[in-house]
Amino acid sequence: MKYFTKNFEDIKETQIIEKIDESQNSTSTYINDINYVSTDIRGNKYQITAKLAEIKIENSELMYLSDVVAFVFIKNKDTVKITSNFGKYNSKNYDTIFSENVIVTYPGHKITGEYLFFSFLSNLGTFTTNVVYAGEKTNLFADKIEMNLATKDTKIFMNDTGKKVLIEGTK
């Protein structure tokens, strides 16, 4: 496994393998089993791993990821786990887009959907497309969920104000 560690200033680099993408006529760098860790000044940590990362030379700050697992460790809070089939990670600002079969779990809660935009610097996540929240006693079906991972403050709503969030009791 290869590791990247980023503490907003320092980067430990790993060996990379370059391949030519002949169909796009551009050069990309591919990294297997990538692990990237970022820590902010408050002591919060964001770790993202993927089976495969592609970095295109023309925009090297973006990594296109496959089989993604991420953890958000907020100081003195529960750990949040995020998994998805694909992701796009920005190594400059740590913003990440998770897509296809996105699952977010933390103790007693699970959110699933097809698209999640996550900002580590602001600890905000926005879920869209087929969003389902499952709690210990309630399931919610909505178009959009916005969540602050530090405070766990959550907004759940529909895009069309004429529609309502569907709420089901589970017990």
Residues covered by each model-derived region:
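Mature-chain termini and adjacent capping regions
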Residues: M1-K171
